[in-house]
Each structure stands twice: as structure tokens, then as C-alpha cells.
């Protein structure tokens, strides 16, 4: 099924969603477009203005512009915006992360307003970045929004729980099968299923790119489909297009590192991408895991080194 075209979409009640373009841009990873739309759109109520600001500041977080979020969201701001600020604070200040998680645990142990979808999403994001997917899933299961379900699917797929991800996708499709988020989640699940579903996943990423914009998220999705089908050279071309858009994008660089191995590229090519990733994202989980494996290898090598 084709994804929705950009424009004002109607909800089930027939009402036009004034923030459709803002949300759609965010969901496909077109963060600057999301910011531009958010600054341009005229809204009918203060509640919608808060919702707009949530997406505006989340887009700044996605661009790693944490200072904007921390400076502009005040103690007097709405609870939804406080939740966004918490996530920005967690990402921006590494030495405060443990304290932020402790405070979040305290808040989760009290009565949580489950209608505050933004809080659930931001809390789950903190937990997931803190290597606690179980807490993230428990948090998301308290919400029933498409975005909570989409994030649940992402986490389940990272945990290799395709069975549970498919059940969650069915719930999304029952709620709104034409929504951009549902289309993306369908592509993620199809990518995990593999086989003939890979082409279906590719078509979703391609159609969204054609109708909206070929973002880094969509290009990496297309490249993953090509790679899973053994089309390594085609995947490399798509990833190079993504790299042209952002030379420090972590997912693109990680995919190029993996791809270089499959294509038998010289070691210096792989090392170049690895250096770019280290420069831009020194604390990225991939880098931490890579360095841990390097240390393990060095330790093993010492054990088998010839004695003098």
C-alpha cells in the first residue's frame, strides 16, 4: 500500500491535522524540514502549539543541537516539553546520565500520566540509550499511540524478537495502516523477515523518499534492503549518497564499515570510516563495542606471543 502523500491529513474524526507536515517530516528523518514547518505553521490552540514545540525540539535533538533545547525550555514550560528537555540533558551531559536515570526511576515509580505520550517516549528513549531495553518497553506499553508502538517495534527488532514485533505491527495496522509511521514500521519488520519481504520493504522506503525526501533514514533503509539481497555495490551507491548529505551520520558510517568488509575493500577504507565515526561519535555503542573487542584481541594475542 502506498504511503500517504505530504499535506494536511485527516484523522479518523475527519478533522484536519494541522501538524501533519511537521510530524511527517520528523518521522522520515527530515529534521530541518520539520523545524522549518514548525516555525511556519499557524495553529488553532495552545495545546497544538505545545505539540508543535515538542516536535520542533525533538528535531533539534536529532540534529545534536542540545543547547537550543536546554536553553529554550524553561522550568515553567509544559510537562511535555520538560520531558523533551530531560532527554536532551541526558544526551548532552555524560557525567549527569546516572543522576538523570535515578530521577527518572523515581518518577516512574510514582503515578505516571499515561496520556502524556511525549513523557513515555522520552523516558523510553533515555532507558534505551542507557542499555535498559526492558525498562523502555515497560514504559512504552503504557501508551497506545502509533509512535509508542513504532518505538516498541524498533526495540523488539534490536532484541531479535520478530514474533512480538509482528504482533505490535498488527496493532498499528489496525489503528491506521496508511500512516507514515505504520508504513515505516512495516518496512522495518519486512526487513527483519527477509526473503521476498525485502523487496516490499525497499518499495516503502523508495516511495516515501520519492513523495517526501530521500532522507538519511530512508536511504539507510534502502541500503539495508540491497545488502540483505546481496546487492553490495548498489547498497554502496545509496550509502555514498547518504554520506554526501552528512559525513558524520553514525548509521551511514556503520553500514559503510560493514559493507567495506563484504566488498573486500582495502583495510584503510574501513579504517577511514571508523575514524570518521570515532571523531563524530566517540561514545557511540558501536565504537565502545569495537574498542572492547580490540582490547580482548590484544589481551589474547599477548597470551600466545612467543616468550623471549
UniProtKB/Swiss-Prot annotation:
Keyword list, A-Z: Cytoplasm, Cytoplasmic vesicle, ER-Golgi transport, Golgi apparatus, Membrane, Phosphoprotein, Protein transport, Transport, Ubl conjugation
Source taxonomy: Eukaryota, Metazoa, Chordata, Craniata, Vertebrata
Role description: The coatomer is a cytosolic protein complex that binds to dilysine motifs and reversibly associates with Golgi non-clathrin-coated vesicles, which further mediate biosynthetic protein transport from the ER, via the Golgi up to the trans Golgi network. The coatomer complex is required for budding from Golgi membranes, and is essential for the retrograde Golgi-to-ER transport of dilysine-tagged proteins.
Keyword Protein transport: yes
Assembly and interaction partners: Oligomeric complex that consists of at least the alpha, beta, beta', gamma, delta, epsilon and zeta subunits.
UniProt similarity note: Belongs to the COPE family.
Gene3D superfamilies in the record: Tetratricopeptide repeat domain (1.25.40.10)
Localisation per UniProt entry: Cytoplasm; Golgi apparatus membrane; Cytoplasmic vesicle, COPI-coated vesicle membrane
Gene Ontology cellular-component annotations: COPI vesicle coat; Golgi membrane; nucleoplasm
Gene designation per UniProt: COPE
Principal place of residence: cytoplasm
GO MF, any single term: structural molecule activity
Keyword Cytoplasm among UniProt keywords: yes
Bilayer disposition of the protein: Peripheral membrane protein
Post-translational modification Phosphoserine, affected residues: 13, 45
Pfam families referenced in this protein's UniProt entry, alphabetically: Coatomer_E
Name of the featured protein: Coatomer subunit epsilon
PTM field: Polyubiquitinated by RCHY1 in the presence of androgen, leading to proteasomal degradation.
GO biological process entries: endoplasmic reticulum to Golgi vesicle-mediated transport; intra-Golgi vesicle-mediated transport; protein localization to axon; protein transport; retrograde vesicle-mediated transport, Golgi to endoplasmic reticulum
Cross-referenced InterPro entries: Coatomer_esu, TPR-like_helical_dom_sf
Amino acid at each position: 500500500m502506498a504511503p500517504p502523500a505530504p499535506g494536511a491529513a485527516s484523522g479518523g474524526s475527519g478533522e484536519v491535522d494541522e501538524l501533519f507536515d511537521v510530524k511527517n517530516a520528523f518521522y522520515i528523518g527530515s529534521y530541518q524540514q520539520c523545524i522549518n514547518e514548525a516555525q511556519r505553521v499557524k495553529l488553532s490552540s495552545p495545546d497544538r502549539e505545545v505539540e508543535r514545540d515538542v516536535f520542533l525540539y525533538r528535531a533539534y535533538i536529532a540534529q545534536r543541537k542540545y543547547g537550543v533545547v536546554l536553553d529554550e525550555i524553561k522550568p515553567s514550560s509544559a510537562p511535555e516539553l520538560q520531558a523533551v528537555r530531560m532527554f536532551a540533558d541526558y544526551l548532552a551531559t555524560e557525567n549527569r546520565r546516572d543522576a538523570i536515570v535515578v530521577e527518572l526511576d523515581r518518577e516512574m515509580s510514582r503515578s505516571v500520566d499515561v496520556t502524556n505520550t511525549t513523557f513515555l517516549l522520552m523516558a523510553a528513549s533515555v532507558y534505551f540509550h542507557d542499555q535498559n531495553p526492558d525498562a523502555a518497553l515497560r514504559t512504552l506499553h503504557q501508551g497506545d499511540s502509533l509512535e509508542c508502538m513504532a518505538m516498541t517495534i524498533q526495540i523488539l527488532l534490536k532484541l531479535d524478537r520478530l514474533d512480538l514485533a509482528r504482533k505490535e505491527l498488527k496493532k498499528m495496522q489496525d489503528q491506521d495502516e496508511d500512516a507514515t509511521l505504520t508504513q515505516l514500521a512495516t518496512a522495518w519488520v519486512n526487513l527483519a523477515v527477509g526473503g521476498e519481504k525485502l523487496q516490499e520493504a525497499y518499495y516503502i522506503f523508495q516511495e516515501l523518499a520519492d513523495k517526501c525526501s530521500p532522507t538519511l533514514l530512508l536511504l539507510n533503509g534502502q541500503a539495508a534492503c540491497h545488502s540483505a539481497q546481496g546487492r553490495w555495490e548498489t547498497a554502496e551507491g545509496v550509502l555514498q549518497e547518504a554520506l554526501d548529505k552528512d559525513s558524520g551520520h553514525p548509521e551511514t558510517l556503520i553500514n559503510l564499515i560493514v559493507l567495506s568488509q563484504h566488498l573486500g575493500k582495502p583495510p584503510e577504507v574501513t579504517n577511514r570510516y571508523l575514524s570518521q565515526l570515532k571523531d563524530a561519535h566517540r561514545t557511540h555503542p558501536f565504537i565502545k563495542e569495537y574498542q572492547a573487542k580490540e582490547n580482548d584481541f590484544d589481551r589474547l594475542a599477548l597470551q600466545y606471543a612467543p616468550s623471549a
